Each structure stands twice: as structure tokens, then as C-alpha cells.
Design a protein with these regions (language model features):
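Charged, amphipathic alpha-helical linkers/stalks
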Residues: 69-154
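Short Cys/His-based metal-binding microdomains
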Residues: 25-75
Length: 285
């Protein structure tokens, strides 16, 4: 077939240059399903983009952002709603498990507050998790204390007092994006999208390296870059609800996995924040 390739000893549907299924139509629907119904689908296409986690106490199902139709659904929602399972689990007497799910619920609520920026709330989440990790064992009382309005407000004020120069932020995100793109380049994935973005990232890295023999040109470039960043930040604001939905879904689906402990949660939160930073920077470029 013209649509299949051999991979890992199996014949699978070959994706296009943008790593998209060739059977998606302009409305992001499967033309096979439209024409013949969902009985023609493979097992992968039947479950995609759904994901299921099987915990000892219950199963959780969620939609994943790898499908463009899911992004469209989230874009229509002001805020996503997720089930609270901690109370049900606490009734079973499994305190250790229920408190981890309560922690996830607290973080989901924290990221749902549009009165602060996404970046502020990600920082607050990370600092709270660090403190909780250092003050184990994790208890419901400890969570209520660290996520209380007064504690979060105090933490937010402390974060706002930290000097975070925008150029340093751009430079770090630039390096992060280049580092995370290495594996995609090795696999030859998303090249049409990644190559021009990475070319710009490399240009910025070189310009900010302070190796120029003309300091005036450096200052002009940095000033122009900051202006572009400010304009970008304003253009991004209408998409904050969608980005919050994406991040909160990542927290619900990836923060707490079967057999996770608090250290795993802390590491997963770091990855989610890195993921957001790299997506934001690729959009900027």
C-alpha cells in the first residue's frame, strides 16, 4: 500500500512530513471513518488519543494533546473539570495514596486561578513541592497549610521580588528548546517545523553570547529582541485559557502515575514546566 511502511518488523501507516496521519481531512477527522464508519479502525486509532492509568484503587481515563481535535475541544472550554478522588480514597483507609491525589487536586486548583500568570503559578507549584518534599511525611494537614491563601500569597510576593531579567529568560528557554529538540532531529521528526525554529534559536544564542566586536550592535539587537518579546507576551494572552487547560490536563494525566511517590511528583512537575517553557518559546520564535 502507498500509505503503509515497514517499522519494527510490522507494517504501519506512514505519517506525512509533519508527522500527521495522511487520512486526516481538512476538519481533522479521519476520512476512513467518515466514509466507512469506525469499524475499519485499527486498535491504535480506536484508543487514540485516549490514555488510561490503572491504579490499585481505580482507573483514570484522559484525552491527550497529541491530537489536534483535542486541542480544538480544549480551546472551546474556559476551564477543564477533573474528578476529585481523594475523599473517596480516604474513606478506604489508604491515607498515603489519598494524600497524593489531594496534592494533585491542590495543584490543579492553583493552576486554575487566572488572577496570576501561568509562570507565577508554575513557580509557586514547584516551590511548594520542594518544601513538601523536604518536610515529609506528607499529610493532609501539611497540604492545607502550604496551599492556604495566606501561604500562597506570601510565596507569590516573594517570587515577585525575585529579579528575573527577560534576556536571561529568553536565553535559557532558547537553550532548553535546542536541547529538547536533539532527539526529534535524530529521529527526523517535525523537520519542516523544527529546522527554521532552531535556526532562529541558534541565531539568538550567538547574538546573546557577547562575543561581538561591536557592543552598540549588541545593545541594538537586545533592545529589539526585548520589544519582540513584549509584543509576543501581549499576543499570547488570549490563548492563556487554552494553555491553562493544556497544563492542567498534563498535571492530571502525568503528575501522578501508578507507584508514584512525592519525589516522582516533583520530577514530573519539573518536566511539565520545561514542556510549557519550550512550547512557549517555539511559538515566540
Amino acid at each position: 500500500s502507498a500509505y503503509t511502511i515497514k517499522k519494527d518488523g510490522q507494517r504501519v501507516i506512514g505519517l506525512d512530513s509533519d508527522h500527521r496521519c495522511p487520512f486526516l481531512n481538512s476538519e481533522k477527522l479521519c476520512c476512513l471513518v467518515v466514509a466507512y464508519g469506525d469499524k475499519v479502525l485499527s486498535e491504535t486509532c480506536t484508543t487514540f488519543p485516549r490514555e488510561e492509568h490503572r491504579f490499585p484503587t481505580h482507573n483514570e481515563k484522559m484525552l491527550m494533546p497529541c491530537c489536534p481535535a483535542v486541542i480544538d475541544l480544549w480551546n472551546k472550554q474556559k476551564s477543564l473539570h477533573f474528578p476529585n478522588v481523594s475523599d473517596t480514597l480516604s474513606d478506604t483507609g489508604d491515607t498515603d495514596t489519598s494524600v497524593l491525589f489531594l496534592l494533585r487536586e491542590k495543584l490543579l486548583n492553583l493552576l486554575d486561578d487566572s488572577s496570576r500568570t501561568i509562570e507565577e503559578e508554575l513557580l509557586e507549584s514547584f516551590y511548594i513541592l520542594q518544601e513538601l518534599y523536604q518536610h515529609q511525611p506528607l499529610t493532609k494537614e501539611l497540604l492545607e497549610d502550604y496551599f492556604s491563601d495566606s501561604t500562597v500569597r506570601e510565596l507569590g510576593n516573594a517570587i515577585s521580588d525575585i529579579d528575573l531579567p527577560p534576556l536571561d529568560l529568553i536565553s535559557e528557554c532558547n537553550e532548553l528548546l535546542q536541547d529538547l529538540s536533539v532527539n526529534y532531529q535524530k529521529e527526523g521528526l517535525y523537520q519542516d517545523t523544527l529546522n527554521p525554529i532552531l535556526a532562529l534559536a541558534e541565531e539568538i544564542s550567538e547574538a546573546l553570547s557577547k562575543n561581538s566586536e561591536n557592543p552598540e550592535n549588541d545593545e541594538t539587537y537586545e533592545s529589539s529582541l526585548l520589544e519582540q518579546w513584549e509584543r509576543f507576551s501581549q499576543h499570547l494572552k488570549p490563548y492563556e485559557p487554552l494553555l491553562r487547560n493544556f497544563l492542567r490536563n498534563e498535571i492530571f494525566s502525568d503528575l501522578l502515575l501508578p507507584d508514584s511517590d512525592l519525589e516522582n511528583v516533583l520530577v514530573q512537575m519539573q518536566w511539565i514546566a520545561l514542556e510549557y517553557a519550550s512550547i512557549r518559546h517555539s511559538i515566540f520564535l
